[in-house]
Amino acid sequence: MTPSISWRLLLLAGLCCLVPSYLAEDVQETDTSQKDQSPASHEMATNLGDFAFSLYRELVHQSNTSNIFFSPVSIATAFALLSLGSKGDTQTQILEGLQFNLTQTSEADIHKVFQHLLQTLNRPDSELQLSTGNGLFVNNDLKLVEKFLEEAKNHYQSEVFSVNFAKSEEARKMINDFVEKGTQGKIVDAVKDLDEDTVFALANYIFFQGKWKTPFDPEHTTEADFHVNESTTVRVPMMNLMRMLDVHYCSTLSSWVLMMDYLGNATAVFLLPDDGKMQHLEQTLNKELISKFLLNRHRSLAEIHFPRLSISGSYNLKALMAPLGITRVFNNGADLSGITEENAPLRLSKAVHKAVLTIDERGTEAAATTIVEAVFMSLPPILHFNHPFVFTIVETHTQTPLFVGKVVDPTRK
């Protein structure tokens, strides 16, 4: 008989931030030509790419008039870690919802590729600050399954903290301090409140700080119009740059594509749709196209006008993950018996994701030939990012999508 007591688990999936960084005058570029070509890394990048754009389209479906910003790799890491302690249909839903084909990839291999990915992302880089972290907050009288703890530490580099959830304010502060420290103070007060029967919390964060290889000159930034929609226009600081840049027009997406590298191993891909083509861009964009853009680069003289911006995203993942098939972990049928040795069932009561982004002149702070067409003109192309656009930030060694976003209104944080 199922016990009448039900304990709750809080998942803080992907608390992430991107923040701008001042340019270092004496920084030398790192050789990023040696991409991580291992099959595991390629599979992970493909799965995360599919997951990223599935999640993006669901966010657009929920609201196509708001800024969007999230970290697919951070959300996926949190749920993959949770799957370590799940069983049966609960585990299957999580892993298939993350776009893994369980007939081709074993559970053990999935956790190994996450381990490899996290080791790659946390690799020291003097030019690019990129770090991730996982924290397990366990009620001090709750006994966890030793195998779950060992694998969480081994595969996901998790830290474990003993917490008295009966003192909810102290527990909330401990979780918030962990996130605030991991994001270097950019995300504070991540947890607003805790359910009274919470006994376990999992927090994942990602922090990214990058400097543009080709920075904007602040002296060239001017006030300009940004057209939110046909009836709304806002004034924004518009950064201006004319250089040799990776710019081309993609007829498949009816969009201009701008790729801007960071010092280190990351690239931002900005997609500016033609008038009236945003919906077409969002329905057509996929991981394969992003990969082709990164492999078929076309540097040419171009002039760009790009808004200085600071946006954020905060999401209830329970509603967001349901269309991807991840539902059982949130209800009373959840099987998370691989986490705790206690008899009372555990279920995920709340899963939240928060991300913040700043792009300015210095950089970002928080994160087939027939398809890609290069347009050659006698005059350099001029790109005005003065209406809604889509972007992704990719770790170039693995082509992992770190962040995905949409700017509808740069003035709305």
From Swiss-Prot:
Chain intervals for the UniProt region annotation (RCL): 368-387
Alphabetized SUPFAM superfamilies for the sequence: Serpins (SSF56574)
An example Gene Ontology molecular-function term: serine-type endopeptidase inhibitor activity
Record localization: Secreted
Signal peptide annotation: 1-24
UniProt GO BP: response to cytokine; response to peptide hormone
Glycosylation sites: N64, N101, N265
Family: Belongs to the serpin family.
Domain notes: The reactive center loop (RCL) extends out from the body of the protein and directs binding to the target protease. The protease cleaves the serpin at the reactive site within the RCL, establishing a covalent linkage between the serpin reactive site and the active site of the protease. The resulting inactive serpin-protease complex is highly stable.
Subunit structure: Interacts with CELA2A. Interacts with ERGIC3 and LMAN1/ERGIC53. Interacts with PRSS1/Trypsin.
Protein name (database record): Alpha-1-antiproteinase
